[in-house]
Amino acid sequence: METLLKRELGCSSVKATGHSGGGCISQGQSYDTDKGRVFVKVNSKAEARRMFEGEMASLTAILKTGTVKVPKPIKVVDAPGGGSMLVMEHLDMRYLSSHATKLGTQLADLHLENKRLGERLLKEAGTVGKGGEQAERQYVDQFGFDVVTCCGYLPQVNDWQKNWVEFYARQRIQPQMDMVEKKSGDREALELWSALQLKIPDLFRDLEIVPALLHGDLWGGNVAEDSSGPIIFDPASFYGHSEYELAIAGMFGGFSSSFYSAYHSKIPKTPGFEKRLQLYQLFHYLNHWNHFGSGYRGSSLNIMRNLSK
C-alpha cells in the first residue's frame, strides 16, 4: 500500500499512522506522508471507483461553496487486488457537540448558496465589468448532478431535470421500488407506491423550490467537529430540495434542537413540511431495505400508507 501511495501521490515517504476508521460500506486508514497526513478509504467492490468518484465530486462541490468544512479530496486510485481507494486530507475529528448550532447555520448557508448566487447574478445582469466570479460559480437552475453519486453503495440517478417532483419520484423512489420488486416482488409495497404517486403533487402545491446543493446522506455518523467548527463527510451530493437533507438527519438522531433552531432561523419551515419530510424519509428507508434487508420494510410501508390517505 505504501509503495502504491508513493507512486500515486508523488511522495517520497508514506507511513501508516495506526489510525483507522470505517462504516457499513468502506474502511479507512491514515498515513503520514512528506506532503502531509492523508486518509485513505478502501472498498473492494467492483463498482467502488464510481462510488468514490461521486464522493470526490461531492466533496469538491461543497468545498467550492466555502460554507461548511469537508475533507479536501485528493485522488481516486485503483486498489491492488480490485476495488478502489479515495485519498483525502486527514482531519482530526471528534463527535459533534459544541458546534451543533454552527452546523445548523452553515448547512443553511450551503443550501442557500445557489439561490443567493442566482439572485446576485440577476441583480448584476446588464452591469458592465462584473468581474470573474460568474465564471467561477455558475448558477444551477435544474435538479441533479454532473456525475453519479452513491447513497451507501447504490448509485443514484442524477440526470438533470427541471421539475423537482418528477425528479424525486422517478429518479429517487422509483429506482428503489424497482430493486424491491426485483428482490422480493413485494406486491403490497408496489400497490402502496402506485397509490402514493397520485398524492405526491399535492404535497408541493404552491411551493417554489430553488435547487440547493445537498450533502445527500447527512445522518449523525457523517458529521463531526474539530477545534475550528463542524465537519461533514461521506457525501452523496446533488442539487435538490433543501428539506430533503433533514430527512435522514431526523431518522437516527445525533442532531440537537440547537442545530434545527439555527437552521430554521435561516430557512423557515413552510406549510406541509412534516409530510414532505416523511416523503423524503421514504427514500432512506427504502435505501436501507435494499442495503440491509426487510427490517426496514415496515417503516417504508407505513410512510406510504400515511401519505396515501
UniProtKB/Swiss-Prot annotation:
Q: Which InterPro entries match?
A: Fructo-/Ketosamine-3-kinase, Kinase-like_dom_sf
EC?
2.7.1.172, 2.7.1.-
> What does the function comment of this entry state?
Ketosamine-3-kinase involved in protein deglycation by mediating phosphorylation of ribuloselysine and psicoselysine on glycated proteins, to generate ribuloselysine-3 phosphate and psicoselysine-3 phosphate, respectively. Ribuloselysine-3 phosphate and psicoselysine-3 phosphate adducts are unstable and decompose under physiological conditions. Not able to phosphorylate fructoselysine.
Q: Which organism is it from?
A: Mus musculus (Mouse)
The modified positions for Phosphoserine read: S20
Say if the entry is tagged with keyword Metal-binding.
no
Recorded GO molecular functions are: ATP binding; kinase activity; protein-ribulosamine 3-kinase activity
Annotated keywords: ATP-binding, Kinase, Nucleotide-binding, Phosphoprotein, Transferase
Q: Which gene encodes it?
A: Fn3krp
> Which catalytic reaction applies to this protein?
N(6)-D-ribulosyl-L-lysyl-[protein] + ATP = N(6)-(3-O-phospho-D-ribulosyl)-L-lysyl-[protein] + ADP + H(+); N(6)-(D-psicosyl)-L-lysyl-[protein] + ATP = N(6)-(3-O-phospho-D-psicosyl)-L-lysyl-[protein] + ADP + H(+)
Q: Which family does it belong to?
A: Belongs to the fructosamine kinase family.
GO CC list: cytosol
What protein name applies here? Ketosamine-3-kinase
* Active-site positions on this chain: D217
Taking the record's annotation, the residue ranges forming a coiled coil are none
Print the domain comment field: The ATP-binding domain is structurally related to aminoglycoside phosphotransferase family.
Positions bound to ATP: E89, H90, L91
